[in-house]
Structure formats: structure tokens, C-alpha cells
């Protein structure tokens, strides 16, 4: 859960 812009798959 870092940044939805960089890791959208980590929702």
C-alpha cells in the first residue's frame, strides 16, 4: 500500500 499511482496492483 505505497502509492496507487506507482503500485495500483498493490491495492
From Swiss-Prot:
Keywords for this protein: Cytoplasm, Stress response
Induction notes from the record: In response to low temperature.
Main location, first listed in the record: cytoplasm
GO cellular component: cytoplasm
Subcellular location: Cytoplasm
Protein name per its UniProtKB record: Cold shock protein CSI5
Amino acid at each position: 500500500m505505497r502509492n496507487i499511482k506507482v503500485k495500483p496492483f498493490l491495492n
